Amino acid sequence: MSLCGIDEAGRGPIAGSLVMAGVILNTEIAGLNDSKVLSEKKRESLFPIILENSRYHIVSFTAHQIDEMGISKCLAAGLESIMQHIDSEDFLFDGNSTFGVRGLRTMIKADAKIPEVSAASVLAKVTRDREMVELAKKFPEYGFEGHKGYGTKTHVDAIKKHGYCEIHRKSFKLKALEPTLF
């Protein structure tokens, strides 16, 4: 039975979705690595190659779902969804927690070591980044196309000026936005 590599993108941002992908590669793909160390151009070039040469499942949780369920429950639900949609007996998730889901292994830095997890990393990141670029058109004042929803100074300044929008994770508290006594 083939290995299904699983990774996520968007666990830490203060806006946008959490995207998870599971991948079984049908063939070896050159150039795979942790999506965070690949250039955007390289990730975009690998994306269709991975889609054409794998069995995969991508699942996404909106900011509203993250606020309602919590990030850990979203991760668990994503893992379960991938395991239900991909036929494998060997599931490997990047990181050190199964989030209570049985039947999978974890490995720290698997996205840099295991091609199937690297491929999942690329699918998740490209899917999420494309979503943030589209959302930037709807909410241009936040600059999502640049920071992709992470808590950069530019993003925090935009929140201070415009307030939160519907894709912000209200459950993620930012010290920079908390009122101060002095």
Task: Please provide the spans of the model-predicted regions.
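RNase H-like, Mg2+-dependent phosphodiesterase core
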Residues: 1-182
